Amino acid sequence: MATMPASEYEEPFVTVEEYLRTSYRPDCDYVDGEIRERNVGKYEHARVQALLAAWFNQHEKAWEAQVVTEQRVQVSPTRVRIPDVTLLSLGSQPDVILDPPLLVIEILSPDDTYSDTQERTQDYRAMGVETVWIVDPKTRTGRMCSGAEWVEASRLEVKGTPLYVDLPGIFSQMTSA
């Protein structure tokens, strides 16, 4: 019985430089030479993302933080993640974020797995991101990680800053016209 060489089964290795020169639609994560598709395109995910971005945008000057969505963040020399929502200090930013953001928010999609979500948040924390939030549109809940523990809360905050969001207010807009 003939077998195919192992190289024909493996995903092609992509250098970080090649990844950063390439545009993907939708954009993909880059993990140790592998291009990983993200779960996007579902209504509830997109709606929560838009509502969170609008919330932070209206507080930009007062909170001295700017919001971006689906922005490449290089979390290590061999990994680039695309958070759903990212809060950065005011001012110009590079095309690929290299410094730890003030806040990273991941919005769960129905196809997201626990292990993938954990790996993503560990990457952000290893980069130096002090606070990561996970928002679940299906259960209308949120968790925040600041330090080593995850805490479920309806009001998500970034310790030592004015940054916060009341999730019931966000979720109440999910059905409004």
PLM feature spans:
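Gly/Pro/Ser/Thr-rich low-complexity, intrinsically disordered segments predominantly at protein N-termini
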Residues: 1-177
